[in-house]
Amino acid sequence: MITNTASTIIYVDMDDTLCDFRAAYIKHRQDYPEITYPQSMPGFFHGLKPLPNAIDTFNWLRDQAQFDVFILTAPSVKNPLCYSEKRLWVEEHLGFETVNRLIISAHKGLNKGHFLIDDNAGGKGQELFEGMIIKYGSSQFPDWLSVRHFFECEVVTDQA
């Protein structure tokens, strides 16, 4: 159940933000060179590994009373199973209660919120997102510890 409508809304991307899409893609290309789109293989999305500190930081954000945290991920047009596999990944790594906070949308700009943590600033509607984009993997936010530091120092302090 979602009840905190006055909270700061934070969306978190999955692929190459929460989980290591790139490493799995490279490994599948090496292991199965005949497969043009590794992400089309059944089990690809469910088998992705979490990025370092991603789970701990996501849980920390979720535990802050002033934040309303959702996962906002785009589907793969190459793999219709990605919908169910991403849902299973969320349950396995973040718990069943987080499944209710999973949004799969091909256009991220349709969602209203304050922050979007994503490895891309465009391509799936991010460029139309009205809040602030926290570009994961950038020089300002190279990892999850820097993302947490931002929210600890900038956002939590401002609301205290």
Regions found by a protein language model. Name each.
Residues 26-30, 87-89, 131-135:
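Glycine-rich, phosphate-binding/catalytic loops in enzymes
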Residues 115-153:
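Acidic, Mg2+-coordinating phosphoryl-transfer loop and its flanking beta/alpha structural elements
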Residues 1-48:
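Active-site neighborhood of HAD-like aspartate-dependent phosphohydrolases
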Residues 73-115, 122-124:
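Substrate-recognition "cap/lid" segment bordering the active-site pocket of phosphatases
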Residues 49, 54-84, 90:
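Substrate-recognition element of Asp-dependent hydrolases with the DxDx(T/V) motif
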Residues 5-7, 66, 99, 111-113, ...:
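A general structural motif
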Residues 45-49, 93-96:
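Short, flexible loop segments at the rims of nucleotide/cofactor-binding pockets, characterized by
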